[in-house]
Structure formats: C-alpha cells, structure tokens
C-alpha cells in the first residue's frame, strides 16, 4: 500500500542546497517576522500557526504548522535546509510498516543531559523546564530521572520522521508543555538566548521517547555545512571517550540533581512555585 510521505525542510533564506521534490517540501520558518521576504515556497504563517514565535521556537514553528494544517499525510518529517536524515525513501517506507519514529544518531555529552541543558540555557530556565514537566506529567518522575540525570545522550536538531499518529502524540505532548514553559519564563526575564525553547525541545524529544516507549530508529545526519559534531572515526572515538568519562567519573557522584543551588533559591525568593524540584 502506498503512503503519503512529506518531510518539511525548514529554511529562513534561499539556498541551492534546499531539497524539493514530491517528498521534501521547503517551508519558510518565521515568515510572519519577515513578511517582505518571499522565498517562493510555503510559509509557516498560514492557517493555525505560531510563526511569530520563531525566534525562540526555531524550526518548531514548521512542526506546529504541519501538525495543524497538513491533511491526509501518513508519514511526516522535519529536516533543515542544509541538514537532513541519511535514509532513503524505500527505507522510510520499510520502517513504517509499523508505527514509530526515526531520529538523528544521538549526541554524546560529557555530562548528564540536564547539565548539558543548563549549558544551553540559564540554570533558572533549566529548573523551570524540569519543574513544568513534573507539574504537567507527575507520573514521569522515573523517566525524568533516567533521561536527564542518568544519561548523557540525546538527539539534536529537532529533526525526525514519524507516522502521523506518533507525530500527533508527540505534538500533543510538546506544544502545550512549551507554551506553559514560555509563560513561566516570561514572568521573570531569565532567558539569555532567544532560541531557548528550541533547545528545550531538543532535550524533550529524547525524554518523550523514553517516557512514551516509542519504537525508534536512529540514523546518521547528512550535514552540508561543516558539522560541529565531527564525522566518521574521529566522532566514534570522541563519543567513546565521553561515554567512558561519563560512566566512570561523572555518573557515580551526579545521580541526584544536588547542584540547583542559588538558582533554585532565587526562583523561590521571587514567589515562583518550583515545589516539584
């Protein structure tokens, strides 16, 4: 049986590397912020959309647009204009004989996933990210402990390919969570980076896979720009070194999030409820 496969290619500018065919569909992310710019393809500012939030949500505005506006799609994905998953259309169809999701190969951190999240945000933002998750999903405490504090691997870029039902389940988890977190972050201005919610979503993808027990396949990423993560043997050696350091040196003394410190005190002193932490 044939399936309707659509993979959105998030782009904010014209580039000859942008893939465009019956499967790969370019989408202009943040179109609402730049109405004067016409890239000649679909914008994320039509129908039900959050295009104006692109500065903080990054490529997630394309994901939201697909969730709310695409119809009759069996398999949906998201790539970047210079980065996509290295998998053929035939292999995509073979995998989706059953439900599941395809993600980029995991990035190996030197620390646990929570500490890595702190390095991308502020400490206050990271605390609120975990506390908001616990408020909305109190049954997820075990998954949070395993994924954020006992693991050093996660998939980056917010790229994926999924059957529509799995995609709908993830979006139904992700966007209410991000909107709630965005509201909490806007009360005190803790954000130092506009792209904070995009970074949070990268971490949440892997958490949700752990929490929802989704069938998953990991594939390499094709990066048409110089990759900050390395390639080939050099990358494998680096990943092994980081894993050994994490298991032998970091994990034994960091299994509990003891290092909230002044950030947690500062949040509470401003009357912000973080009692789940």
Language-model features and meaning:
Residues 1-277:
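ER/Golgi luminal nucleotide-sugar-dependent glycosyltransferases, focusing on the catalytic module
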């Amino acid at each position: 049986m044939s399936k309707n496969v659509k993979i959105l290619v998030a782009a904010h500018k014209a580039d000859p590397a942008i893939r465009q065919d019956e499967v790969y569909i370019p989408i202009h992310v943040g179109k609402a912020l730049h109405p004067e710019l016409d890239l000649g393809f679909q914008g994320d500012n039509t129908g039900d959309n959050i295009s104006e939030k692109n500065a903080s949500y990054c490529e997630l505005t394309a994901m939201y647009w697909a969730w709310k506006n695409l119809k009759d799609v069996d398999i949906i994905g998201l790539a970047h204009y210079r980065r996509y998953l290295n998998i053929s259309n035939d292999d995509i169809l073979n995998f989706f004989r059953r439900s599941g999701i395809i993600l980029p190969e995991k990035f190996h951190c030197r620390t646990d996933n929570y500490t890595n999240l702190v390095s991308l945000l502020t400490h206050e933002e990271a605390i609120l990210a975990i506390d908001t998750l616990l408020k909305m999903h109190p049954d997820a405490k075990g998954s949070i402990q395993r994924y954020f504090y006992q693991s050093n691997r996660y998939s980056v870029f917010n790229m994926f390919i999924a059957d529509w039902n799995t995609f709908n389940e993830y979006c139904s988890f992700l966007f209410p969570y991000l909107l709630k977190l965005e509201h909490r972050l806007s009360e005190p201005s803790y954000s130092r980076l506009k792209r904070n919610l995009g970074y949070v979503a990268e971490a949440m993808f892997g958490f949700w896979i752990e929490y929802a027990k989704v069938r998953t396949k990991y594939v390499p990423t094709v990066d048409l720009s110089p990759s900050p993560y390395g390639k080939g043997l050099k990358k494998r050696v680096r990943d092994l070194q980081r894993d050994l350091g994490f298991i032998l040196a970091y994990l034994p003394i960091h299994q509990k999030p003891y290092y909230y410190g002044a950030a947690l005190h500062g949040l509470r002193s401003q009357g912000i409820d973080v009692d789940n932490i």
